Swiss-Prot record:
Residues 406-418 have a biased composition (Low complexity). Keywords: Calcium, Repeat. The lineage of its organism: Eukaryota, Metazoa, Chordata, Craniata, Vertebrata. Disulfide bonds: none annotated. It comes from the Eukaryota. This is EF-hand calcium-binding domain-containing protein 13. The keyword S-adenosyl-L-methionine does not apply.
């Protein structure tokens, strides 16, 4: 860091001669006065430049501190109406400081605002007044003193604080809209103004939040803002959308008032209006209504309202075009009759509506500070005229407009030109004194928002009064910081205080504290929107390179899946230069991406995770959440679990407690199933079972209605005289029933059938659905059947073709071919082939319409396939209109076709049987015809083995797939 020190001395003498009869600002007496003033100025200038290494991080950053000590010797003689002369000598010593900063562009705006706020709060009672003088030197000196500010180090507490955030939550919707559209002109906004506007919109975005958009960003607020600004093009809105835009901003207005406002607003040939004109006109109108209702003797009728509205609209539009406060008062747009009243209203608006006569002297500066608008003409105090009225006017809105229409470097001079000088005052001597509010006229009740604002203002004034010294106690400083809008954690405050110098009494030096605070807080704010800045850099002349398009979206916090991005890029035209119009791309994305539609809601997964993080949940919300997760928790199981948990008075339960109960219930159910299998094995006596125990045996192995099955079995001829039943014969009889035979045949073909992949099914569906007048080429037909793994023999295929009319183009009617193929033995036996072929005929957009599929199967008299389909899709969640994705469909079909393979070892096979509603059919012991495993083991050995391995066994029994539980690989059979 480089430091340069410059010392210089300057001396000047001013002679100020006031003739008899001239008006003095201190008295109305005529006098002759000769003033002799001698100035000796010692100045020290310190210039600090940051080293090149640091400069790379903070470019163009330089501070210049100038401290001046002025010794002023004054000799004054006066002659009052010929009486004796009075002479007076005085010596004044004053200290001035001037600080110049060359700062990076991204900090320039906040620095200028803070400097203006500091200047407006730093006026001291003994500062110089500017007098007319005959000496050119004095004029030059006055200008120099205008640019300087008195040393007031304690006010630099607010240097690094973004004061635009203060009280943003306490603004009404209309005032928020005014602040937003004061920053936005022609649809554009300065990057430096983005944090303030996003704060008002309650959109919190940082670099970390950009990376974790779906987890932390306030998407609702972003979408609300998006809905508002998507209708605004170049700062203009269609007249038909004005009401909707205002309503979405939360600005209450009836259509009659809006129509009246629109009448006095410029409408272009496209029936578009400037939304800023509408909002500012409404704000002016509202303030005038409040003035009229509070000021005594000012009734308001419809005629006055209409005239006043015209006056407001005309006044605002004229004021907007000039972009600065004119020295002349605006003329009325309706009639001369309202001239006086319009001038009074306008003057009151310019003087800050809630200024009262008994406010502290610095209230005006504080209100400007809170509003985020300041003035740079600190060194000038306008004199008061005879009637005591201060004609110094400032317009917050004028400065806001001006800051947007001119470069940032000109803001200081622009703000200075907005204050009326003495020549301006002399040009309007007949201006009437504006109406001043009287405390006795404040009859209406103050709203809670106003009370909060007043309380906050009082706290702020109290904090300012305490910051009048260069040193302050650390505890007191920490207590008043929140009143100034600086919220620090205890750790942050202690860290800053530790790095701050103190005096012998242990009090903190404010200037040092402010510098430490600036270092602590400035850099994170500079990195508030790095992603947005990167995205803006990629946009050149409204176009983005095609390869940078997805990265640009991600910098804005928009993450699209690959299919979504591909779909949108296909709908967007790229020029010869491989560039895409970014606005057109966004419009295409908004209209063609489901997640950005007007019905935007958070993804179900995000909502579910958010709900599950809550400590307590209502019973209804818990059931809906678990249902959306497809948790396979049945309603009776859910109700049973509720009986075991604590439900409070608000019908809420602890989620962790509920989850623990459900886990215990599931473990108990699995153990119970295992115990039932063990009990079934205990009922066996070798390979025989007593008839009286047959019902319990079937119930334990999972048959839902064992009584009916037992009655059928006991009537069979394989029951012995002592009412004993051979378990092999019992199982064979059970398999011969219709519902068992259909299921077992279906499972048998699974061992020889290779299921097609999802992409193959889509390909087959695409071939079979795109036919010309019902005709399909034979090569395409063969390819579609091959994709479905339909193992038709060549003889069956040719036989089906021979029964159909084949054209010269080798095309065949698809319906005729399918009818003939239905008669083939392979198709009749293969239920899986029936389901797959029917699925391809109704598959659309990767969705299977379950109702249409069942109807098609029934129309083709494929009742068994329809029954299997019903069981297969029993627990599959359906989308809208009763549709299921093809991925879920094939997963369930694969699950139901899975069958274990034999490995030459003893296995207990638990096969999931859909026809018997979730229960397991257990094939065990001795030889079973056509079974996978042939095993012969004694009852004692079986019981010992199954008990030994029950822990590993119960983890498999209730799965939807057919699973294998290994018992003893070394058993001898």
């Amino acid at each position: 860091m480089e430091t340069k020190v410059h010392l210089f001395c300057q001396a000047e003498e001013n002679i100020d001669l006031l003739d008899d009869g001239s008006n003095s600002f201190a008295t109305d007496l005529s006098s002759g006065t000769i003033n002799h003033k001698k100035y000796i100025k010692f100045s020290k200038t310190i210039e600090k430049e940051i080293s090149p290494e640091i400069r790379s991080l903070s470019p163009e950053y330089k501070k210049i501190f100038e401290t001046s000590i002025i010794f002023c010797g004054e000799e004054k003689s006066s002659d009052f109406s010929g009486e004796k002369k009075v002479g007076r000598k005085s010596l004044q010593v004053q200290q001035h400081s001037k600080r110049t900063e060359i700062i990076p562009p991204f900090l320039k705006l906040s620095k200028e605002k803070v400097t203006r706020k500091e200047n407006s709060l730093c006026k001291l009672p003994n500062q110089y007044s500017v007098h007319k003088t005959s000496s050119p030197l004095c004029t030059s000196s006055a200008i120099t003193r205008e640019k300087e500010m008195l040393s007031n180090l304690y006010m630099t507490l607010y240097d690094e604080v973004t004061h635009g955030y203060l009280h943003s939550k306490e603004l009404s919707a209309l005032h928020k809209a005014c602040k937003i559209f004061s920053k936005i002109r022609s649809g554009k906004i300065y990057v430096n103004d983005l944090p303030v506007i996003l704060c008002i919109l309650r959109i919190s975005i940082s670099d970390l939040e950009m990376r974790q958009a779906l987890k932390t960003v306030d998407i609702d607020a972003f979408q609300d803002a998006l809905k508002i600004f998507c209708r605004i093009k170049g700062g203009r809105v269609s007249t038909d959308d004005v009401f909707a835009v205002l309503d979405s901003m939360g600005i209450p207005i009836n259509r009659e008032i809006l129509e009246e406002v629109t009448k006095h607003t410029y409408i272009d040939s496209n029936h578009m209006v400037d939304i800023g004109d509408i909002i500012f006109t409404l704000n002016e109108l509202q303030e005038q209504y409040e003035d009229v209702s509070i000021t005594e003797g000012s009734p308001l009728n419809e005629i006055t309202s209409d005239r006043k509205l015209s006056s407001v609209a005309g006044c605002y539009l004229k004021y907007k075009k000039k972009n600065s406060l004119s020295s002349k008062l605006p003329e009325p747009s309706i009639s001369k009759k309202l001239n006086k009243k319009s001038n009074q209203y306008y003057s009151k608006i310019m003087e800050n509506d809630d200024l009262e006569s008994k406010r502290p002297k610095n209230t005006w500066q504080i209100r400007k500070f809170l509003g985020g608008v300041g003035s740079s003409n600190v060194g000038v105090q306008e004199p008061y005229s005879k009637n005591g009225i201060n004609f110094k006017k400032h317009s917050e809105k004028g400065e806001i407009h001006d800051s947007k229409s001119k470069p940032q470097s000109l803001k200081s001079s622009t703000s200075l030109s907005k204050s009326l000088d003495k020549s301006d005052i002399s040009s309007i001597p007949k201006l009437q004194k504006p109406a001043v509010r009287k405390h006795s006229s404040l009859q209406k009740q103050v709203s809670s928002t106003e009370k909060t604002a007043i309380s906050t203002l009082e706290n702020f004034c109290e904090a300012i009064s305490k910051l009048q010294e260069n040193y302050i106690a650390a505890e007191e400083l920490q207590s008043i910081l929140p009143s100034t809008g600086i919220n620090l954690l205890d750790e942050e405050f202690q860290k800053i205080v530790t790095d701050t110098s103190r005096n012998e009494n242990g009090m903190v030096e404010l200037d040092d504290f402010v510098n430490a605070l600036a270092k602590e807080r400035s850099f994170p704010e500079c990195n508030a929107l790095p992603g947005v800045i990167k995205a803006i850099d990629k946009i050149k002349d409204k176009n983005v390179d095609y390869e940078d398009l997805n990265t640009c979206l991600q910098n804005f916090g928009i993450y699209l899946s690959k299919p979504e991005f591909k779909k949108i890029t296909e709908l967007t035209e790229a020029g010869e230069t491989k560039k895409v119009n970014f606005k057109e791309f966004i419009d295409t994305m908004m209209s063609n991406t489901e997640c950005f539609s007007e019905k935007l809601v958070l993804p179900d997964a995000i909502e579910t995770l958010d709900d599950l993080r809550k400590e307590t949940m209502s019973v209804s919300d818990l059931w809906n959440t678990l249902s959306s997760l497809n948790s396979n928790l049945k309603k009776d199981e859910f109700l049973a679990a509720l009986e075991l948990v604590t439900v409070d008075e608000g019908d809420k339960v602890q989620f962790e407690e509920f989850a623990k109960v459900v886990r215990n219930m599931r473990d108990a159910a699995r153990l119970e199933e295992l115990q039932e299998v063990v009990l079934a094995a205990d009922l066996l006596e070798g390979d025989m079972i007593a008839g009286k125990n047959l019902e319990d045996f079937l119930r334990n192995v999972g048959i839902k209605s064992p009584k009916e099955e037992v009655e059928k079995i006991l009537q069979s001829d394989f029951v012995s005289e002592d009412n004993m039943v051979n378990i092999k014969d019992c199982m064979r009889a059970l398999r011969d029933t219709q519902k068992f035979s259909n299921y077992i045949d279906f499972r048998k073909e699974a061992s020889n059938l290779k299921l097609p992949k999802v992409n193959e099914i889509k390909e087959a569906a695409n071939i079979l659905s795109h036919v010309d007048n019902g005709k399909i080429g034979i090569p395409d037909l063969e390819h579609a059947l091959k994709c479905l793994n339909v193992n038709l023999t060549e003889e069956d295929f040719n036989e089906a073709l021979n029964c159909c009319n084949v054209s010269d183009n080798m095309e065949v009617d698809l319906k005729d071919f399918l009818m003939k193929m239905k008669e083939s033995p392979h198709f009749q036996k293969s239920k899986a082939t029936q389901i797959l072929l029917a699925t391809t005929q109704i598959l659309q957009n990767d969705l299977v319409d379950v109702s249409d599929l069942k109807t098609l199967l029934m129309d083709k008299d494929l009742h068994t396939a329809n029954a299997i389909l019903t069981v297969m899709l029993r627990h599959v969640p359906e989308h809208e209109s009763g549709k299921v994705s093809i991925q879920e469909f094939m997963t369930k079909l694969s699950d139901i076709l899975t069958i274990p393979k034999a490995a030459g070892k003893f296995y207990l096979i638990c096969t999931y049987c859909p026809d018997l509603e979730r229960q397991a059919v257990v094939y065990m012991l001795k030889t079973i015809q056509d079974s996978i495993v042939k095993a012969q083991v004694s009852k004692k050995q079986y019981n010992m083995n199954i008990k030994q391995h029950k822990i590993s066994l119960h983890n498999f029994c209730l799965n939807s797939k057919a699973n294998i539980a290994k018992l003893n690989p070394n058993s001898k059979f």
